[in-house]
């Protein structure tokens, strides 16, 4: 009887150790298919214009939000908005621009066995815009200036899961397209043929899987 009890005890320890080992080797699994994101952003300076001139902005900080849904355990579809304040120092322009991204896209993750890290790559399409208010000190009037256009881009980053429902998220996003839609006080202006404008954003925030 004593030998039988020892054999059962040894078998239970072996099974528990094997189950714990298998569990530790499993990749992290979010607690929900839905995900809500909030993040801070840092956008590098960019240039908007054509062969005859351009408007150059400086690097700036901002914030954004996203909402997404896991179509599969690895594929996320999402939509979001991101706004960054960028300085400018051009003749006739002295102040700040608001750089806005409104985008929809998808991200593919690459689970790592036994790790809380979850790397991903993605792609997006959307609309970007630069907006500001131009003050004419000679006349004392102000005008709203906006430059916008469609864009496409790629992104990459990594999540670190603090728990199945909360992950720290950091990444980079690159967008390319023309901002040829120019408006002053809502009236469209002729910009000619604009060059491609590249925007680069670094982001750091958190994902919540409710």
Segments predicted by a language model, with ranges:
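Transmembrane beta-barrel domains of Gram-negative outer membranes and organellar outer membranes
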Residues: 26, 32-47, 51-53
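Cleavable N-terminal export/targeting peptides
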Residues: 1-32
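Short catalytic helix/loop segments, enriched in acidic residues and glycine
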Residues: 57-64
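Solvent-exposed loop segments that connect transmembrane elements
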Residues: 135-142, 180-192
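Internal, hydrophobic beta-strand segments that form the core of beta-sheet-rich folds
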Residues: 172-173
